[in-house]
């Protein structure tokens, strides 16, 4: 079926590539190119690089507006990073892919916060995109165990694979149920979240796993700062 994917981050790029192998992805909606890295050179979002490699047209508005024209009525949102206006949400079927068992870990960093908390299981939720952050009714949800060896990279990879399986199950006409339980929130990772306290080995291990391989935890070794993945 024809779908648009709204994605920016590496997790979104992974889901985009997997979806493109199964569906007709008519466009990618992503964030504009931005300066990045120490040299502050303008760089394309990871999802855009994937779309260009696959020959998928790319849309990069500064912010999506109600007047945005999309070449499909079904939109899969995954790690996009911008709010979508209600007028636009009402024009089609918008489904969000969230790598946690909602309502646990709503927000920007669900995988990282899950590992930081020492969770032993997580999962993927497909839900309707609504104005409130990650609060829409659920179309599909499935859990998986976290092993002591899993880092964020491994969890994101497993979540991307599961997300596409769940989307295949619910499209083109999902049914929805309300989210159940008390929500918790996964705030974005701040510099303080990267700091290791080596006097707390279990906490330090959770931190290293949560921030590997994409961010890195920070500590000192023989008086010198080090980054650990």
Regions found by a protein language model. Give the residues of each.
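One-carbon transfer enzymes
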Residues: 1-225
């Amino acid at each position: 079926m024809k779908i648009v994917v709204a994605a920016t981050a590496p997790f979104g790029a992974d889901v985009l590539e997997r979806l493109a192998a199964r569906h007709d992805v008519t466009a990618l909606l992503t964030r504009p190119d931005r300066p990045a890295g120490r040299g502050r050179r303008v760089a394309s979002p990871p999802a855009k690089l994937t779309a260009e490699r696959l020959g998928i047209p790319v849309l990069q508005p500064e912010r999506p507006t109600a007047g945005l024209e999309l070449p499909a009525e079904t939109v899969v949102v995954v790690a996009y990073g911008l709010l979508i206006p209600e007028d636009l949400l009402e024009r089609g079927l918008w489904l969000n892919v969230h790598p946690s068992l909602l309502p646990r870990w709503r927000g920007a960093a669900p995988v990282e916060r899950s590992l930081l908390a020492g969770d032993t299981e997580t999962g993927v939720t497909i839900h309707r995109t609504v104005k409130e952050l990650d609060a829409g009714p659920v179309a599909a949800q499935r859990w998986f165990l976290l092993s002591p060896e899993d880092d964020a990279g491994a969890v994101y990879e497993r979540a991307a694979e599961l997300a596409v399986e769940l989307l295949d199950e619910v499209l083109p006409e999902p049914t929805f149920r309300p989210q159940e339980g008390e929500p918790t929130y996964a705030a974005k990772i701040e510099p303080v979240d990267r700091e290791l306290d080596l006097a707390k080995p279990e906490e330090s291990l959770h931190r290293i796993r949560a921030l590997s391989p994409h961010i890195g935890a920070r500590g000192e070794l023989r008086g010198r700062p080090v980054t650990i993945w």
